[in-house]
Amino acid sequence: MFKRLKELLAAYQQKDPAAHSKLEIFFLYPGVHAIICHRIAHWLYKRHHRFLARWVSECSHRRTGIDIHPGATIGRRLVIDHGTGIVIGETAVLGDDVLLYQGVTLGGSGKDVGKRHPTLGDRVTVGAGAKVLGSFTVGHDARIAANAVVLSAVPEDATAVGVPARIVRVGRKRVDTLDHVHIPDPIMQELCRINRRIDELAQG
């Protein structure tokens, strides 16, 4: 346990340039507190102490602003940077060395039971405000841009941006032009469809 705590603090110190010492990280970083509480809650959850697990989880949520369901499976060295508003669902699975920024949601697909939440591979980065919704895999070393809405699988070492998210880069190879002008806008597409329908009715 102490070994894992030590490597967690080291991961924070490595990834957060504002972190000046492990002592500061341990006492003052809500992301660390949320992860420690989740380890306890998850241990209780796996042993079918569901009420106690949810109680620990909710106490952590109120203190840190980070909502991690006790059923979620989280790997080693998870770094939560500016964690306010993060939500991690019950059947979510996170690999090792994942980095999450504020406002991230790892949400469900709407199924009543079973695997409903995403699986993130090792070394995945999810930008601020991004939503990853559904039961699919985000591959190792993938990057999700800020405010993206990911609704399907992301390959390893790929970058996903936009609403809904699309793959713009795999490794060093650019898949599509990365610009904000041409990111699909479903609301605008629907308005255009309605306008076309109105024109058709007017002409008829």
Regions found by a protein language model. Name each.
Residues H61-V168:
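Structural signal for interior beta-strand "rungs" in well-ordered beta-sheet cores
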